[in-house]
Amino acid sequence: MAGAAPEGSQFDARQFDTKMNELLSADGQDFFTSYDEVYDSFDAMGLQENLLRGIYAYGFEKPSAIQQRGIVPFCKGLDVIQQAQSGTGKTATFCSGILQQLAYELLECQALVLAPTRELAQQIEKVMRALGDYLGVKVTACVGGTSVREDQRILSSGVHVVVGTPGRVFDMLRRQSLRPDHIKMFVLDEADEMLSRGFKDQIYDIFQLLPPKIQVGVFSATMPPEALEITRKFMNKPVRILVKRDELTLEGIKQFYVNVDKEEWKLETLCDLYETLAITQSVIFVNTRRKVDWLTDKMRSRDHTVSATHGDMDQNTRDIIMREFRSGSSRVLITTDLLARGIDVQQVSLVINFDLPTQPENYLHRIGRSGRFGRKGVAINFVTKDDERMLSDIQRFYNVVIEELPANVADLL
């Protein structure tokens, strides 16, 4: 389960700039390595032929902005801090960097990737396996909620890459089922979430068990001050690839709000929307597991076909629900922030924040589902009186204006 952010850690632009200035001040001026090369095609990156085959077979034609700048320094063994929003090809960036450097004849774990949720870890495992299809990569996901014995069996048979959540990975290292001797690459994905209070200590514990000379990659959609601070602890002159704060919201996603006078009127507002819009697929976010169940029951009682998933469900049930949603047999998914970072569905055209997120950072992970790789999408936020402060925080955080939902919203989908 993703850890909660530290008390009082809401993003503050001045705090961010102060921390960045500290890192770039006289004491920190040598902290970063500059790397300015941009590669307009995958062919120009000097990648192995069989890795290129995997990249093209996966459906990539041209590298995204983060891939143009991020794959090659990682392939060269440099430590990297990369900030890019959801849906920009961030996962494929570090997967390509890892796959390029593996010694495939050595069937030992050489790369360890940590992610904050099971769903995201499994998503990364799929991308790694697909891109490395022609290289013969052996990759496994070690995540909570699955059989420890099965993980131990797979690890003892030999793998090149382990992707996992911090708790299970630390457990495997502690039991010596995962041997760290040959690990030469360590990646933290969604570091903003991982380095919040819930996982910070576990990451330190894992890092202590890894070889001293190791390449570290930190990948994140947002870069709160604590994420920048912690990079000092275990990175060596990293290449820094940051997008400006005001570029963080995905282009192509239209964002609106609907004023709802009372919390209990949100349901009527939602049903009205579904009666007026032709929706391919949509995700509805609420803030608690109990509310997922409540809203699912209410929608079904009004003859809306919906699926629901949250952290109280066992892993097998969640996998089945996500498979149905990906295949399109289920068109509406109700969920919580916990799963926001593991949903990768190309057809999602609409995200509804039935509840606004409790932290501005999570807004990006939610609406980033609705327009991946330039696809158009719409995000609609339900806003009560109590939410007005958070709405203005979100607008300030991402430097965007979220407008009131127009009458012709159907034309936008």
Curated annotation (Swiss-Prot):
Its EC number is 3.6.4.13. It comes from the Eukaryota. The keyword Iron does not apply. One of its GO terms (cellular component) is cytoplasmic stress granule. One of its GO terms (molecular function) is RNA binding. Residues 71-241 form the Helicase ATP-binding domain. Residues 252-413 form the Helicase C-terminal domain. It holds the Pfam family DEAD. Keywords: ATP-binding, Helicase, Hydrolase, Initiation factor, Nucleotide-binding, Protein biosynthesis, RNA-binding. PROSITE patterns: DEAD_ATP_HELICASE (PS00039), HELICASE_ATP_BIND_1 (PS51192), HELICASE_CTER (PS51194), Q_MOTIF (PS51195). eIF4F is a multi-subunit complex, the composition of which varies with external and internal environmental conditions. It is composed of at least EIF4A, EIF4E and EIF4G. Belongs to the DEAD box helicase family. eIF4A subfamily. ATP-dependent RNA helicase which is a subunit of the eIF4F complex involved in cap recognition and is required for mRNA binding to ribosome. In the current model of translation initiation, eIF4A unwinds RNA secondary structures in the 5'-UTR of mRNAs which is necessary to allow efficient binding of the small ribosomal subunit, and subsequent scanning for the initiator codon. This is Eukaryotic initiation factor 4A-15. It comes from Nicotiana tabacum (Common tobacco).
